[in-house]
Amino acid sequence: MSSSYASSCTKLISLTKQLSSYANQGNHEQALNLFLQMHSSFALPLDAHVFSLALKSCAAAFRPVLGGSVHAHSVKSNFLSNPFVGCALLDMYGKCLSVSHARKLFDEIPQRNAVVWNAMISHYTHCGKVKEAVELYEAMDVMPNESSFNAIIKGLVGTEDGSYRAIEFYRKMIEFRFKPNLITLLALVSACSAIGAFRLIKEIHSYAFRNLIEPHPQLKSGLVEAYGRCGSIVYVQLVFDSMEDRDVVAWSSLISAYALHGDAESALKTFQEMELAKVTPDDIAFLNVLKACSHAGLADEALVYFKRMQGDYGLRASKDHYSCLVDVLSRVGRFEEAYKVIQAMPEKPTAKTWGALLGACRNYGEIELAEIAARELLMVEPENPANYVLLGKIYMSVGRQEEAERLRLKMKESGVKVSPGSSWCLFKD
């Protein structure tokens, strides 16, 4: 072996390490410049690892044209069947162009192992195409692995009936004798939390404890919230007390649990303890406090926390924060204040915000603001029959049958049908 060849090999190895360092540390433009230099100046062929790193940086730096060029050179070098190059190509096309481009490439890859299948499944779930992800899983011609199930389970959470289907895939995962890991458990806790599956939450908690996953702070925070949604304050406190490092997520989860349980006093006390522990509250922590105030009708306290959120911590109030404040003010009959809050919103009020005001107006017989809220609500949700029914009931409760009848006719002309089981007889055909 000549000294020049040995020198070239040594230099190539050194530059590959440098390329890897750039790509893994997020210095993607530097990585791509180095790749172009290596590709143009070396007589020695670059290996699959170099191409996969270049594609990773193309995806991160959003460089689809260069990514296409690297793709062409990958094909020329016969690297398309390499799983690392294949996954990197899928990632690049999925992020820079579209999932359909990624699928087209996936169909062209000659040898697809589980890693490549999982990459395509993950692309579908990341862009919300869970149906396609499940169909692709069912079409797998290789043995699935933990990542296959994790991608599906994680993608299903938050979709319609997704929690139940996520649990079904968890059961399949167990049948395949795969061990759930932290990713699996985090998704499952979210799924169980959404449907109040208390027994399964305990099962997951027990499994995590036996397999030494339970100490992970993110999982513990998820368990606190999940137990809270099931109304099990005993388990909530048990998990929280076992946490050594309580970050803002953990504290927020505990506040949320108390709020859901209707214990506003404990929720506010927990918020104060969090501040004493020198943990800076975030927007979620304040939202949970406002929810606790709303459930308990603590309007003055809600106003204080709403102002502190912006004044003391410089946090921007979202639509959800405004909705909570409107809700608590409306609940205690402070309609004018609630309406002023809505008018001061920097963004367009949501149906939830107007609905909170309208519902409270009905309870208190406040017609003038009810009409304003209903008019705005019908603009936001013109096809929701519940909005017509609620305003109609308000009219009828104060003896304004003519307005109720006009509303019924407007509803009929608009093609909006009343929900089955509505108690408002005027709206029945």
Curated annotation (Swiss-Prot):
Keywords, ordered alphabetically: Repeat
Family matches, as PROSITE patterns: PPR
InterPro entries, alphabetized: E_motif, Pentatricopeptide_rpt, PPR_At4g14850-like_plant, TPR-like_helical_dom_sf
Keyword Disulfide bond carried by entry: no
Matching Pfam families: E_motif, PPR, PPR_2
Record-annotated disulphide pairs: none
Ranges occupied by PPR repeats: 11-45, 47-81, 82-112, 113-147, 148-180, 181-215, 216-246, 247-281, 282-312, 318-348
Record protein name field: Putative pentatricopeptide repeat-containing protein At1g03510
Organism this protein belongs to: Arabidopsis thaliana
